[in-house]
Amino acid sequence: MPLLDSFKVDHTIMPAPAVRRAKGMKTPSGDDITVFDLRFVAPNKEILSSEGIHTLEHLFAGFMRDHLNSKDVEIIDISPMGCRTGFYMSLIGSPDEQRVADAWSASMQDILGVKEQKDIPELNVYQCGTYKMHSLEDAKEIASKVLERRIGVMDNDALALDESKIG
């Protein structure tokens, strides 16, 4: 089975928090689609709590749209990684990594401003598949660490996986 794009980078040297342009492609009509790796914590060193990443999923998607969507960019989806170290963001357009990092930082500030658990969007049995599995406190702690550590930009060439390491 061929390696997927997300597994062609060496996770042992991946910095966090950091933005990586994971993939670019075109729609049939010629529009750019870009996928970003938004790595919150270093792989295999830290892991985001289930409740924290779930709450981030509800908050981050809206706040990123507030800060990044424009005439040349429209976010399609922001989804948590199964490894719980970050999110993938797919969008129409091709913003540079620093623009994405700036929107991410602003979104983390917004998360710190959320007052109460009841202020989390779609936090109900009708709109969320695990509506009781949330922690605003964990989400704020994650946001605070991201801001404290400062978001960097990853270099795909520097992270290229030496496939001989995996046999």
UniProtKB/Swiss-Prot annotation:
GO biological process, one term: quorum sensing
Cofactors that this protein relies on: Fe cation
GO MF term (any one): iron ion binding
Enzyme class: lyase
EC number in record: 4.4.1.21
Keywords assigned by UniProt, alphabetized: Autoinducer synthesis, Iron, Lyase, Metal-binding, Quorum sensing
UniProt catalytic activity: S-(5-deoxy-D-ribos-5-yl)-L-homocysteine = (S)-4,5-dihydroxypentane-2,3-dione + L-homocysteine
Binding positions (Fe cation): H54, H58, C128
Entry superkingdom: Bacteria
Pfam families hit by this protein: LuxS
Record carries keyword Lyase: yes
Co-factor remark: Binds 1 Fe cation per subunit.
Family: Belongs to the LuxS family.
HAMAP family: LuxS (MF_00091)
Assembly with partners or alone: Homodimer.
Annotated function: Involved in the synthesis of autoinducer 2 (AI-2) which is secreted by bacteria and is used to communicate both the cell density and the metabolic potential of the environment. The regulation of gene expression in response to changes in cell density is called quorum sensing. Catalyzes the transformation of S-ribosylhomocysteine (RHC) to homocysteine (HC) and 4,5-dihydroxy-2,3-pentadione (DPD).
Name this polypeptide is given: S-ribosylhomocysteine lyase
Species of origin: Sulfurimonas denitrificans (strain ATCC 33889 / DSM 1251)
Lineage, uppermost ranks: Bacteria, Pseudomonadati, Campylobacterota, Epsilonproteobacteria, Campylobacterales
